[in-house]
């Protein structure tokens, strides 16, 4: 179990309160698919992912980005049991979807970059970044828990 300080809990809640999943999710997932094009293989049913403009304008990318960020809401609400909260999601990605778990780290990095660009250095300070990174590392580890 991860130990969270009161300050860390406050920072996570504060950042989460500023996030609009309808905006942040699509941008973060699009960034993943553009910067790391090999991740597109998991989204072959999404249609045209041939270039950045196609990815940014793809409604299936946008919709799934919202789902991904919405999934983080569960981790925010269950900070003391992220692994248990994500057990079924981890199993789905491992057993059914066969997603390489290293891609979760790439997506977390894309989400962090998206947030830093959105909020700027006055809000997304190094101290906030540190806590947010810890939170995402816990979420990524929980998603990878069911992999063998």
Swiss-Prot record:
Tissue specificity is: Red blood cells.
Sorted UniProt keywords: Heme, Iron, Metal-binding, Oxygen transport, Transport
Q: Where is the Globin domain?
A: 3-148
Q: Single GO cellular component annotation?
A: hemoglobin complex
Binding, heme b: 64, 93
Q: Which CDD domains match?
A: Hb-beta-like
**Which domain of life does this protein belong to?**
Eukaryota
Answer yes or no on keyword Endoplasmic reticulum.
no
The protein's matches in InterPro entries, at most eight in alphabetical order, are given as: Globin, Globin-like_sf, Globin/Proto, Hemoglobin_b, Hemoglobin_oxygen_transport
- BP terms from Gene Ontology: hydrogen peroxide catabolic process
An example of a GO molecular function for this protein is: peroxidase activity
Its biological function? Involved in oxygen transport from gills to the various peripheral tissues.
Q: Which family does it belong to?
A: Belongs to the globin family.
What is said about its interaction partners and assembly? Heterotetramer of two alpha chains and two beta chains.
Protein known as:
Hemoglobin subunit beta
Biological source species? Silurus asotus (Amur catfish)
Gene behind this chain?
hbb
